[in-house]
Amino acid sequence: QFVYQLRTQLVKQILDTPVAQVDHLGSAPLMASLSTDIQALTTAFVRMPELVQGIILSLAVSLYLGSLSWPLLLIIMLWIVTTIWISTLLVKHVYQNLTHIRDINDALYQDYQAVIEGRKELALNQHRAKNLYIQDLIRHATAYKKTIIKADTYHLSAVNWSNIMMFAAIGVIFAVASYLGLSLGIATTFALTLLFMQSPILHAVGAYPTLQTAQVALDKIQSLQLADYEPQFVTANTDNNWQSIELRNLDYQYSSQDMILKQVNLTLNKGDVVFLIGANGSGKSTLAKVLTGIFTPTRGQLSIDGRPITDTNRAEYRQLFSAIFSDQYIFKQLIGPEGNPPDMSLVHHWQHRLQLQNKVSIEGSKLSTDKLSQGQRKRLAMLTTVVEDKDILLLDEWAADQDPAFRRTFYQSLIPELKALGKTLFIISHDDSYFEHADRLLLMKQGKLIELNPEQRKQASADAISML
């Protein structure tokens, strides 16, 4: 139950953590925590009874031996405490090495991610593949091997030291018993009892590094600084009666980097079809994430119908949007408005409008796909977002991966259809041939936002590159 709660709570915390923070962490540390750290805590939870059993038996046996001879018990306890103290010094090195191993694990997960996600690029460049394999993977794997050997060496040293001292304690028992004038029977009872206790004590010592590994895992999870655990999701119904969204004197900055957005002012009216153009790196995608509430402005104000968007209502505000970003993840489960089952007639309509009827099959409300091109994947993402039936649809260079014929269909046919359905469209685009289909044309230039007047729009349509 403990491990179940930890796993589910960790996933919920990731869901509730601001996207910018998760992006900064990267997927490798999160995957390492969800796999390696959870596994370490699971193992520790299984080994915990051994430690508890060893402690309880030691206390019970101590009371029994104390009834036979307190002086002899105190001397043996001093012997055992000394043994444990030295073992603890050895185990301290185990903990230090386990902490280092956990850091190496993060690096290894990054290497695995590079090998899997960069497989096409690596296949085309064997020099890069060799460098990744030798300079990164082999180096990290070697560091892991050496560090785990060190940790195991200290652990085995602690176990062997405990074994030797426990057997030596038997000789001490008979020597001290003779010195104190105790009977041979009492000395034999002490010796046999100590031999009986050897296994539980060694099991407890063996379980201790596992518990230390779990402590390292907990420390690593806490170092992620994820959002506090909240069992509930935002369930408030979306208010579709909004009229305008305003950005006033808005700045955004990634941690200690230069300002990405500078004094941005924008009013987005319901039903608008807005195109945003600009050079690569000008801040277009960042503006999109701030507008949708995914990123929190560094300065300035985001508001809807005059109501400021704050931490208390930002999650509810985000429910107004469906978005397709450049790194869109496609979920196979289709979801309709407010999380209800999708309208299948709407699904099939858009499946045909997006020319996916021969590429994607739909079983129930789940997508079943063969291999799709990048452009077809973007169309599939469009299908999943349209059936959500959100008020605002944001598309980040969605048409860039479409062939010329379907790009024309998108601008000349799909955009008017979505507008007729009452959707507000915010589209990041470089397609200067289709700027006339926008109600408004915005230009992002070096972090600043400019709305183009009719004359500037003509120039942008004639030669978009010169405007950037």
Segments (PLM) and residue ranges:
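ABC ATPase nucleotide-binding domain helical subdomain, centered on the C-loop/LSGGQ "ABC signature"
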Residues: 318, 332-367, 412
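Cytosolic ends of transmembrane helices, especially the final helix of ABC transmembrane type-1 domains
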Residues: 153, 197-229, 233-234
